[in-house]
Amino acid sequence: MTISGGNQHNNNANRKYEKLIKQPQMQFGSSVTGTQTDVDSCRDADADANAVRQDFSNFNKHFGNGHAITDRTMLLRLEDDVTTAAGIVTYKGKSNGNGNGNGNGSIGSISLDFNGSPTSSTSIGIASGSSSNTHLASGGGVGGIGGSEPAGWMCHCCNLIARRCFGINVRRCVLALLAITMVSIFYYTHYVDTGVFNGLIQRDTHPAPIINCRMINSGGKHIRNASPAPDHRSEARLRIDPKVLVFVETTYSGLGRDIAELLVYNRIKYKIEVAGKSLPVLTNLDKGRYGVIVFENLDKYLNMDKWNRELLDKYCREYSVGIVGFVSPSEETLVGAQLRDFPLFVNTNLRLRDASLNPLSSVLRLTRAGETAWGALPGDDWAVFQHNHSTYEPVEWAQRNTQEYPADSVGQVQLPLTTVLQDRGQLDGIQRVLFGSSLRFWLHRLVFLDALSYLSHGQLSLNLERMILVDIDDIFVGEKGTRLRPDDVRALIATQKNIAAMVPGFRFNLGFSGKYYHHGTREENLGDDFLLQNVQEFNWFSHMWKHQQPHLYDNLTLLMAEMHLNYAFAVDHNIPTDSGYSISPHHSGVYPAHELLYMAWKKVWNVKVTSTEEYPHLRPARLRRGFIHRNIMVLPRQTCGLFTHTMYIDRYPGGRDKLDESIQGGELFQTIVYNPINIFMTHMSNYGSDRLALYTFQSVIKFLQCWTNLKLASAPPVQLAEMYFRLHPEEVDPVWGNPCDDVRHKKIWSKTKNCDSLPKFLVIGPQKTGTTALYTFLSMHGSIASNIASPETFEEVQFFNGNNYYRGLDWYMDFFPSESLPNTSSPMPTQLGSPRFMFEKSATYFDGEAVPKRSHALLPHAKIVTILISPAKRAYSWYQHQRSHGDVIANNYSFYQVITASDSAPRALKDLRNRCLNPGKYAQHLEHWLAYYPAQQLHIIDGEQLRLNPIDVMNELQRFLKIQPLLDYSNHLRYDVKKGFYCQAVSEKRNKCLGKSKGRQYPAMDERSAKLLQRYYLNHNTALVKLLKKLGSRPIPQWLKDDLSTGT
């Protein structure tokens, strides 16, 4: 049956065949007047009318279902003939608006077979009127459903709906049909594994690697035995430091930034200088400070003033230091322009294509010649070099872009144009490598690294060994339709074998969550089984049982219980449990460190190694580092451009070209080039569907073999971690950052932790300068609170400067209560819940070598408060402090013996000497703090003024800290005659002073020691005066003036 709505009237009525046919009206109350058209043949109107009556009777039986009981009539007007063909009668008519609704006179048609059954090809169109009831053919059509021959339960439902559709409200009918449609979609996508529908899913679009090298066969082996990469090392490297001096046009120039980032990525030390200024110091005693000089703009070198040019050239000749220069783009196009003082000519502002390398160049080491980078090169501002002297040799060639510059004649052969040039130094004794374009072209990045190696005589050479490990996270985790099938597992094994031929020892590393085993479709469950049947083919590591984030657990027992479930699953399915490696879902709990995770890992899995992309931050990738915490080595993890949702090549963000760009010289390629040890994160979904991970890693490894001399290999995680920390021992200690400063970190940090409780300012010492008195005065303020006292170090936490730092951030934060807690020791009333200024006082922070870096990482916005007194007086006070506490060395050696102890003295004596003398090098330590904190966050207190006039000192400190309300210390501090210093006034007649150990009177320092210390600190005190003047906000203390006047 077909019922459809139209919007036109048939005015070609043949009135002589018009009849009225009464039929019981359908329940929904619509009256239909039909107009018959499309006449084939019909001569007897009465016979046709009878046929119509019979058909409508059958129609009402089918769709009225006994409910068409109203007295209204269906009026059918026969105009022209009734079409009858193949047992089907078709009526096309228009509504006359009879019934309860307001008909709009739309054309309608009804098709029935003579048996009263719907035709095998069924479509239903429904029109609605404007009244509360709905009518057949009473307005614009609003919906429909089409289908083919009924099959199974779905078609049965459709027939049932069709038969009852005219016995209920049409709007409900539409909703029912939509519901059936949604149910059918859900059924087919979640429960049907085979058949026509499943075949519609694109599963045969697996991209194949297209990287082909002329020098490498299909098995990843070089066709001819390639000569080993040249060794640039020579004895000249012994006279220079492994550091690069980079001259830039401005501190914000783009190429200068690219150069600096490339050096950072490869951990090459460098110094940036703005060209045009005076040269920095180039030598240190008899050694050159820099191994290579780099000019972002070659013109800055060529046009350097005579004095600086001669100094620089003399340094380069004397220490065999080379120069790298880049031809800077300019608006003026040069043709055959000669470089100043050199028999060298340049053409600029060219568009080029098809770059290749000179296989005879002695510069190349990391980079392999023999291939061509086909296609247009980036940019339209290339410079090419022309020369006629034997000192010059091309390193890189390119062709003119014929699309931009057509050849003069058809078939003309273009000569290669030199885009990177080596100057052997035959003219002036200085070797150079000149680039005709920036680092936008990926090949220039490799050649630039080779130039640094060559010009520094191997001092800046990179190791050519690269380790690659590919983790496959989320095994058994994934929605239906995204998981692995048996064919995917076979492809995984086959690809692993192919990669292993190019990367010795390579095996995929699979991380599993056992809870979701057999949670796919039937075929995907077979894939799970097939994966476990081949468990021996891979390396394995544990995720969490249900892929939970560990930082959400505050109970160690529960966290361990979840791990035990995954462990039991591994045992039941013969998965190895001794890898010593684990990955936390979403890297939760690794960094920021969740201490319970590290504890549970050790107890359940005996984890020795993990990895994360979050330390210290996800971006920029060049700054990712490793660390060791609780004897678990944490390695930096790399991304490869594939994530859980990137499963199909045609849906890859940016398209296939974007992925290929990353592989062929882009981000993924450069990640492996720059990192000696690479652990890549992928997911199970990347190995199903289009198997993008297999395509990606096969392609990038082949591309690496085409263009580099890198030696690729793989090893288990524990072995990689040991190698990593041998290469980078400076990364063993972690640096705890503030989780609230990184949105990603905050998401994987416990919700029970709050950065607001961290201290807003630090009192850093040094020791024996009055820090305890300052601590006491600050605690009197109602809006200021300090940490909870430590059972070991009392009011000092001593977190940033000792072994406490390795206990982790959680341990440190436990010392700081909620900032809303009242300060019960304060005489100043405070309201519960008012803002609090938390602070920490640890006098050992001042001269701690690692303290400024560590504190700035966690508390970058904190204010820093320090107290300075005469360094000689401070040294003597520390010695007497140790004597009073029964220190054996202090009681057995005089002060003079201690401060004059040699480096060959007993270790304990040297330690005491250092603790007496080193903190007094004030300028040196302050400069260290100012390397991390701006001067605006540093407040220096004159220790003598704190002792003699604490009220003014405390008022000034409150203004610096911007604390409200201000506390009037004149009402709370009183000079105590017996103690000889100010104390807290608790009543009119009683003071609360520090203990007996504070303010102790010592014997006067002997004159010999005093003179020695005045000479010892002379240069340090002079530097302090210069620093204070530079800061400009502090007057020169009187004790400093006295020390300098006496010393002279």
From Swiss-Prot:
Q: Which UniProt keywords apply?
A: Disulfide bond, Glycoprotein, Golgi apparatus, Hydrolase, Membrane, Multifunctional enzyme, Signal-anchor, Transferase, Transmembrane, Transmembrane helix, Wnt signaling pathway
- Catalytic residues identified in the record: K768
Which loops or segments lie on the Lumenal side of the membrane, by the record?
193-1048
Q: Where in the cell is it found?
A: Golgi apparatus membrane
Q: How does it sit in the membrane?
A: Single-pass type II membrane protein
Cytoplasmic compartment ranges equal 1-172
UniProt record, GO biological process: epithelial cell migration, open tracheal system; fibroblast growth factor receptor signaling pathway; glycosaminoglycan biosynthetic process; heparan sulfate proteoglycan biosynthetic process; heparin proteoglycan biosynthetic process; imaginal disc-derived wing margin morphogenesis; imaginal disc-derived wing vein specification; mesoderm migration involved in gastrulation
Provide the transmembrane region boundaries.
173-192
**E.C. number(s) listed in UniProt:** 2.8.2.8, 3.-.-.-, 2.8.2.-
What GO MF annotations does this protein's record show? deacetylase activity; heparan sulfate N-deacetylase activity; heparan sulfate N-sulfotransferase activity
Q: Which catalysed reactions does the entry list for this protein?
A: alpha-D-glucosaminyl-[heparan sulfate](n) + 3'-phosphoadenylyl sulfate = N-sulfo-alpha-D-glucosaminyl-[heparan sulfate](n) + adenosine 3',5'-bisphosphate + 2 H(+)
Against SUPFAM superfamilies, the record matches this protein to: P-loop containing nucleoside triphosphate hydrolases
Q: Pathway involvement?
A: Glycan metabolism; heparan sulfate biosynthesis; Glycan metabolism; heparin biosynthesis
Residues annotated as binding 3'-phosphoadenylyl sulfate are: K768, T769, G770, T771, T772, S877, K998, G999, R1000, Q1001, Y1002
Looking up Pfam families in the UniProt record yields:
HSNSD-CE (PF12062), HSNSD_N (PF25119), Sulfotransfer_1 (PF00685)
Which cysteines form disulfides? Answer: C983-C993
- Which residues, renumbered to this chain, are glycosylated? N388, N555, N823, N892
Q: Output a single Gene Ontology CC term carried by this record.
A: Golgi apparatus
**Cited Gene3D superfamilies:** P-loop containing nucleotide triphosphate hydrolases
Q: Give the InterPro entries listed for this entry.
A: Heparan_SO4_deacetylase_dom (IPR021930), HSNSD_N (IPR056793), NST/OST (IPR037359), P-loop_NTPase (IPR027417), Sulfotransferase_dom (IPR000863)
The main location is: Golgi
Functional note? Essential bifunctional enzyme that catalyzes both the N-deacetylation and the N-sulfation of glucosamine (GlcNAc) of the glycosaminoglycan in heparan sulfate. Modifies the GlcNAc-GlcA disaccharide repeating sugar backbone to make N-sulfated heparosan, a prerequisite substrate for later modifications in heparin biosynthesis. Plays a role in diffusion of morphogen wingless (wg) via its role in heparan sulfate proteoglycans (HSPGs) biosynthesis, HSPGs being required for movement of wg morphogens. Required for wg signaling during both embryonic and imaginal disk development.
The annotated subunit structure for this chain is:
Monomer.
Q: Which family does it belong to?
A: Belongs to the sulfotransferase 1 family. NDST subfamily.
- Kindly provide the name given to this protein in its UniProt entry: Bifunctional heparan sulfate N-deacetylase/N-sulfotransferase
Q: List the source organism.
A: Drosophila melanogaster (Fruit fly)
